[in-house]
């Protein structure tokens, strides 16, 4: 378990099926399933959102991000992913399931 309560290696994360993704120019937004919240995604969150098209573990996300940006320290990659996933989970934009 990490500091956010996710098992990085075994918990799969996926998009909530009713969450809507919108791109407006260079900006990316999520519209909450209840339609009452809109959140702007930073580039890292948008990239992770795209990776969650199918259920995926944080570990698998970190492997992909690390391969794309090998200069980044692995601990920083994992920390950033954990933070984004925690926020998206707490806001109800994504769901978790066991591997």
Named regions from a protein language model:
Residues 1-34:
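Long, low-complexity, charged/polar intrinsically disordered regions in eukaryotic proteins
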Residues 34-99:
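Long, charge-rich, low-complexity alpha-helical segments
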């Amino acid at each position: 378990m990490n500091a956010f309560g996710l098992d990085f290696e075994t918990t799969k994360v996926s998009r909530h099926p009713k969450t809507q993704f919108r791109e407006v120019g260079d900006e990316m937004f999520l519209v909450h399933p209840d339609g009452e919240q809109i959140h702007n995604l930073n580039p890292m969150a948008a990239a992770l959102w795209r990776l969650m098209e199918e259920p995926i573990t944080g570990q698998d996300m970190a492997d992909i991000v690390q391969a794309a940006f090998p200069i980044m320290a692995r601990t920083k990659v994992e920390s950033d992913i954990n933070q984004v996933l925690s926020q998206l989970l707490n806001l109800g934009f994504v769901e978790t399931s066991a591997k």
